[in-house]
Amino acid sequence: MQQSPHSPQSQSLSASAVDSAVPLSKLQQTYAVIPRERPQTPLLDSVDSPADLKTFSSAELITLADELRLFVLYSAGQSGGHFGANLGVIELTIALHYLLDTPQDQIVWDVGHQAYAHKVLTGRRDQLGTIRSKTGLTAFPERAESVYDTFGVGHSSTSISAGLGMSLALRYQGRAQTVACIIGDGAMTGGMAFEAMNDAVQQDADLMVILNDNDMSISCSIGGFSRHLAMLWESGYQVDISDAGEPILCQRPDMQAFDRRKRHKEQRDVPQLEDNLFKAIGFTYFGPFDGHNIPELLRVLSLAKQVKGPVLVHIYTTKGKGFAPAELDPVGYHAISSLPAEDNAPKTEKAAIKPSLKYSQVFGQFLCDKAAQDKKLLAITPAMEEGSGMIEFARQFPERFFDVAIAEQHAVTLAGGMATQGVKPIVAIYSTFLQRGYDQLIHDVALQNLDVMFAIDRAGLVGEDGATHAGVFDFAFLRCVPNMLIAAPKDENECYHLLNTCYEYQGCTAVRYPRGVGTGATIIQPAQIYNIGEAVIESVLGTDDAPKKLALLAFGTMVETAQKAAEMIAKSPLLASSCQLHVVNMRWVKPLDTNLLETLVEQGVTHIATLEEHMIMGGAGSAVNEYLLNESAAFKIHRPTICNIGIPDRFVAHGSQAEQLADCGLDVEGVFNQLQNLLS
């Protein structure tokens, strides 16, 4: 890395002047509760930009870390959001913004759910409590939000590719600026990260990669790469560069503080220096180091910054650092909800209300039930065991559970390979992440018509995580694939039985369901097999002699909204007597119930409206249009007016799911207004 002309090396805390003897144990604090009132943070309050850090002493930087950690704790309690990962990079964030000349020097965060401290230090301190709210800060770095957010992120394993692109473009333009990519050990399991590292060596790019190794993604990191990192840790510090002619050798922190690593110790002998993967592919390697030791971080990062060519700094951190409950339960504290308001009113006994199941819980229940009946069932997830509702399945059937880490492409083709051997693989995957395995879905599964089922979670709008995590493209990119069946359940009960229906089908299928809880529907046993491509008329409102007849074709979660909007129309003084409404639960996106469509048109419907929590362009409504315009015999004789209701041609900003639906006109009132305009 070339030295920036604005580097702080001449300031009060140069790399050579760092006092590594500062008593960290006396300055670093651990908290047991999330504060409800804004804490006193005098040092942090003086930081309005990274430039304000440059005059801080070593002790002040460590105290700042304590204040920043407490402030992030408080803010997360106010707004909810990603939690453990942010607490684990407080010291690293301070060190980077102290050492680098941001925003001229570029910091790229992988995934971005660990960037809260970065937002605070770059002028957004007083807005942090608004994070993930509709008018507040975004959950992840976003270029439109700040000049310090150099690359928009949200998905995993992209930082090294993006950072390499920046570095090469800067080199081409003759600009000497440092690019630093921060990537976690979980994200490093993604193949894209290795593709980028391979190219960084090929290009001999000046690129700093900081591997934040906390042995976790959302849950514990797994696989051969995780074991390799553990072996590097067990081997002690390994550094390739000399400081004033002497090798840098730093005392390793107390292993008791990192006892999660111990489970790897017996898996293989301690590696030799030549076993280092990063060195083997051509990176200069520093580490591993204690990622919570600011003086040590500054010294190592300062030296790494001077290296020409690609360099990797390996640090070890604790997810949830400084908050005792999160250190003990890093999975449970990956993200939190906002603290409930304090209620000092007298408590009264209330009737117990049975909470609705989450759709991921419905999937988990189906998975366990079916696995107990069919030994051919195998389940795959790309690092989403908890989120996809698979914990109990993994406990009951560990030999049939495959967590492949953050490797969506591999997950899909792995399932294809399994299917060739007479088993039934189920790939549990979020809609937004299935996009990453699209080529494999087409080429390695659908083209061969292999017996693979996709359980697609987080479909539709997902709320506070915003556009990066929205699952609003899957109807479009799946329904154009031959051999593909696509089901969209209206509630928990239908989800369970559609999962069973698709499981029993021989071929490539997908069941698409949303984030969060269902409608409260009871799952009726035993499991049923629905007729493929058959819709259900939920209700008929109005009389047969009404001059206007509307067929409201709803897909998935929009069935309940359609029913409520139809009931509003039926009660409307202007429309009640003049309109008959058929509310249809389409249930299947592919194949459509074309027999029902023909019947509705033949019976003289005057208007057809489709309703989906998906992009209008290319979605289920488009499938209805295509059939009616290109194949329907009845439509050639009688042409009702068609309206497609869904998500418009734009990315939907973060906010609650209810706010997002209202913003798109997909809440009950919004749908009612659109139907009213259609019928007027």
Swiss-Prot record:
One Gene Ontology CC term in the entry: cytosol
Q: Which residues cross the membrane?
A: none
Cofactor details (free text): Binds 1 Mg(2+) ion per subunit. Binds 1 thiamine pyrophosphate per subunit.
**PROSITE patterns, from UniProt?**
TRANSKETOLASE_2
InterPro entries in the cross-refs: Dxylulose-5-P_synthase, THDP-binding, Transketo_C/PFOR_II, Transketolase-like_Pyr-bd, Transketolase_BS, Transketolase_C
Q: Which SMART domains match?
A: Transket_pyr (SM00861)
Enumerate the Gene Ontology biological process terms.
1-deoxy-D-xylulose 5-phosphate biosynthetic process; isopentenyl diphosphate biosynthetic process, methylerythritol 4-phosphate pathway; terpenoid biosynthetic process; thiamine biosynthetic process
Recorded catalytic activity of this chain's protein: D-glyceraldehyde 3-phosphate + pyruvate + H(+) = 1-deoxy-D-xylulose 5-phosphate + CO2
Q: Does the keyword Metal-binding apply?
A: yes
Cofactor(s) it depends on: Mg(2+); thiamine diphosphate
Which keywords annotate this record? Answer: Isoprene biosynthesis, Magnesium, Metal-binding, Thiamine biosynthesis, Thiamine pyrophosphate, Transferase
Q: What class of enzyme is it?
A: transferase
Which of this chain's residues are annotated to bind Mg(2+)? 185, 214
Looking at the record, which segments are called Disordered?
1-20
Query: Which pathway does the protein contribute to?
Result: Metabolic intermediate biosynthesis; 1-deoxy-D-xylulose 5-phosphate biosynthesis; 1-deoxy-D-xylulose 5-phosphate from D-glyceraldehyde 3-phosphate and pyruvate: step 1/1
Comp. bias intervals (Low complexity): 1-17
Q: What is its EC number?
A: 2.2.1.7
User: So where does thiamine diphosphate get bound?
Assistant: 113, 154-156, 186-187, 214, 323, 408
- What is the stated purpose of this protein? Catalyzes the acyloin condensation reaction between C atoms 2 and 3 of pyruvate and glyceraldehyde 3-phosphate to yield 1-deoxy-D-xylulose-5-phosphate (DXP).
Instruction: Supply the NCBIfam families for this chain.
Output: dxs (TIGR00204), PRK05444.2-2 (NF003933)
In terms of PANTHER family, this protein maps to:
1-D-DEOXYXYLULOSE 5-PHOSPHATE SYNTHASE-RELATED, 1-DEOXY-D-XYLULOSE-5-PHOSPHATE SYNTHASE, CHLOROPLASTIC
Its subunit composition reads: Homodimer.
Name of the protein this chain belongs to: 1-deoxy-D-xylulose-5-phosphate synthase
